[in-house]
Amino acid sequence: MSPHLFLPVVVLVVSPTPGAFQDSAVSPTQGEFEDLDCGRPEPSSRIVGGSDAHPGTWPWQVSLHHGGGHICGGSLIAPSWVLSAAHCFVTNGTLEPADEWSVLLGVHSQDGPLEGAHMRSVATILVPDNYSRVELGADLALLRLASPAKLGPSVKPVCLPRASHLFAHGTACWATGWGDVQESDPLPVPWVLQEVELKLLGETACQCLYSRPGPFNLTLQLLPGMLCAGYPEGRRDTCQGDSGGPLVCEDGGRWFLAGITSFGFGCGRRNRPGVFTAVAHYESWIREHVMGSEPGPAFPSQLQKPPSEPWEPREENCTFAQPECGKATRPGTWPWEAQVMVPGSTPCYGALVSDSWVLAPASCFLDSLHDFETWRVLLPSRPEEKRVVRLVAHENASRNFASDLALLQLRTRVNLTAAPSAVCLPHREHYFLPGSRCRLARWGHGEPAPRSSAQLEAQLLNSWWCHCLYGRQGESVPPPGDPPHLLCPAYQEEEEAGACWVDSGWSLLCREEGTWFLAGYRTLSNGCLRPRAFSPMQTHGLWISHVTQGAYLEDQLTWDWGPEGEETEKQTCPPHTEHGACGLRPQSTPAGVLWPWLTEVHVTGDRVCTGILVAPGWVLAATHCILRLGSSTVPYIDVYLGLAGVSSLPQGHQVSRSVVSIRLPRHSGLRPPLALLELNSRVEPSPSALPICLHPEGVPPGASCWVLGWKDPQNRVPVAAAVSILTPRLCHCLYQGALTPGTFCVFYTEEQEDRCEMTSAPPLLCQTEGGPWVLVGMAVRGSRELFAAIGPEATWISQTVGEAHFLHLGGSSYWSPEGSDPCPQDLAGSASSPKVAALPLLLALLIPR
């Protein structure tokens, strides 16, 4: 368990006006401490999901200051003693000096003093010897004040429970503090003390909730000395800045300190109640360390034991609270879809995110007059229109496409117990799994043309493919748990011919265990193609939550990351060409995910050749395989991508195209070795259909090279055989009299059985360390070792294709395909093809890598 994923340690520093609270220590007379009373605040009417407390309601609540601001809470248990949480004072195993801390007593608002408020220095801080981390228990600390507190109406000690004290499950208790009102959402000025009612949960019920993976994919083993309080549905809880503060329960007219705020997984999250230190468990430790204090803390007897503990469900039979958002009867019928009607504009589509707020693109409204009286919001299954009273645009909405968001507050609340439902929003750490089922939904201006249901369905690409296909060059791929820069869908069906998606914006809804999340959005499409990259919603959850104070931010519901979750750690994306990404292939490739540029070229007569996708509408192949020698007939050709032998790749990426023309370079006399096949329509970039990069010179320096083809010509399962490139000098000598200009030689470093079959004319690929794959050559007819170089045809390819991905990898190639150096004497007169006896000599003469 990673302690940094817990959220107990306060990060908020609220600085009151300097000098607002001065230490006005007055030594009380001994008579004031006779028969110390506890747990009795002055009569009064009566955090996350909390509200302002009335002054004097919780007179034992103290504020612990460090560096001039509030850090943690605490409870006054005796005039000279405060009880708090150990994690407030221990950093990396080291206890912080007591003289750096001060205790503010009798305070209600951190912004200004009340009568009776005063400050005390801390003389000593004590923590249990066995404390190390919050999740391992013993999270409590005793603070001895440098001088006793002055007791009065706003400063009184709380009662401590004895070890035998029993708090019944379901008891309504109260937590107080100045902590965040939501995750990373600080309590606003004037920083008034907050109170929230929480119900005690039995150990079995709490362990049941924490045994199921939830936020951060973590579970928790409750230990003796821990206490849970909250609600399965969440929404009310303590949060950062409340640590060390009290959880008090009333018993027999007195308030007892049942728990000390310790930690939680997030704040107010579903099925994740707060975890407190059970004070009764540590009675003996407290008594031992305050022994001799006069007066010490009070441990009143429990007047009446609660009835026998209520029955708790067995852990395997417990019931979890279900999400209250993201429910749709069928995909495509979205109960949260909202149409914002502004006079003079087309409808703007958004989504209902709470009972009072709609989220929509800010670009719909930035040019409109803010006469909200004329604005209306239409919701499904609602005959009445909702009026708008307020618009809050994201602060970067006009400058940043990724922040094109606005929140519209409705005049009257929507009853969410009936239709419509609000959509769920992801937390910052939400990781939508690769392969997640998603769907496009309307977003922003425009009325999209009718689409078939299948055209809107998609699965998510993994982060590596998404960021490397559509992100910035060289950007690091965020690992799971970090907010992504992009979300990318892979569509289940190819686009209909002639379809154009440019007239409307789209949002991306993704489903987890039957619950729909608003995962991303895109206001404008790129050309006529379906949107390929969406701005993620994870980075905006805190802003939405802060504004709405009620949006449905929901925890991740599926956690089976599998190998995909490990692939993206510490990876960066290779460089792009001016036409985009090319030659991409993950460093660790799952079984079945192969070479996205490799194509099967099916020629009339059941002949199958190897082809390489070099641009969205072009495939490169060997001429001798495509065109029969002496034939003047142009064959009928189909091209297939995304095939792994007889089965398709995951996510259904099967692409087929027909060839409309064959282009050959103009060579004098000889038949050119390379042919370009023009496809009838472009291929959408995807992990199984992506152009390779072309290197216009020789072999890139420091490259590893492979012959890529099929070992079995029937099933055509791709296989890659490692090779070394011979220098032009060695190649010329070994093929004297038989070497065609523009060809080069390779030497296989693997055994014979690992080589590719050659009838389909396999390609030669090279890759520099961490870089993309580049195409260097295509096999020459009838040879395993001879290849026609791509470099000499670079100009022809560029002029013909227009979008070929030429990538200059830098440095000087260690060979050029042309060369006529004289042969060494010991190789002069070699046969026209390499002999086995010559291989050791060849290896010795190879230029080292």
Curated annotation (Swiss-Prot):
Entry GO CC: cytoplasm; extracellular region
Post-translational note: The 3 protease domains are not proteolytically cleaved. N-glycosylated.
Peptidase S1 domain sequence ranges: 47-291, 323-567, 584-802
GO biological process: proteolysis
CDD domains: Tryp_SPc (cd00190)
Localization in the cell: Secreted, Extracellular space, Extracellular matrix
Propeptide: 20-46
Highest rank taxon of the organism: Eukaryota
Record's signal peptide: 1-19
Molecular functions per Gene Ontology: serine-type endopeptidase activity
Disulfide bond sites: C72-C88, C173-C249, C206-C228, C239-C267, C348-C364, C438-C510, C466-C488, C500-C528, C609-C625, C705-C766, C733-C745
Sugar-modified residues: N92, N130, N217, N317, N396, N415
UniProt entry keywords in alphabetical sequence: Disulfide bond, Extracellular matrix, Glycoprotein, Hydrolase, Protease, Repeat, Secreted, Serine protease, Signal, Zymogen
Major location category of this protein: secreted
Annotated active site: H87 (charge relay system), D139 (charge relay system), S243 (charge relay system)
Record remark on domains: The first serine protease domain is catalytically active, whereas the second domain lacks the essential His residue of the catalytic triad at position 363, and the third domain lacks the essential Asp residue of the catalytic triad at position 673. The second and third domains are therefore predicted to be inactive.
Family according to the record: Belongs to the peptidase S1 family.
PANTHER family: POLYSERASE-2 (PTHR24253:SF100), TRANSMEMBRANE PROTEASE SERINE (PTHR24253)
Name this polypeptide is given: Polyserase-2
Organism name: Mus musculus
Taxonomic lineage from the root: Eukaryota, Metazoa, Chordata, Craniata, Vertebrata
Chain's gene name: Prss36
